Amino acid sequence: MMKLFVRFYLLAAILMIQAGCGSKAPTPIVPDPPQQEHQEQDETNKAEDTMPSEIKITVSGKSLPVKIEDNDATRALVAALREASITYEAHDYGGFEKVGGLGRSLPSSDSQITTQPGDVILYSGNQIVLFYGSNAWSYTRIGRMQYGTLDELKDFLQSGRGNITVTLSL
């Protein structure tokens, strides 16, 4: 009887050992990518997240920089410009501005503003107004064109000479 118990315990021990020794391959250890790749990606993300200080307005092959505000409207505009330039038609209005529809809406935070020549303004959330004169109204400021003289600005915007094609870009 003792031999039977010994054999039983031996058989049970062998079965337990075999059950613990499966045929599953060990999980490979994958090294972390080099730290430099993470840094390059972080720098790319930071560059994309960084708000530029200027955008560019082009009319008839000539361009002017626009020093932009830091607000929701300009952040949305810059995000759109990172995808592609925006081109729209603008027309004279009131003898002091060129206005045109963007074909999209931007967030607005209108407040009473007295504009000056060179101001770039968001009106009604979906129109860009380029001022070569002055007006007081409730607008969201986008920025200010960097130009020489008032005559040069009026010439750039072709004030009083009909519609123009405006391209906004980074």
State the predicted function of each range.
Residues 22-24:
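Bacterial signal peptide processing site
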Residues 17-20:
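C-terminal motif of bacterial Sec signal peptides marking the signal peptidase cleavage site
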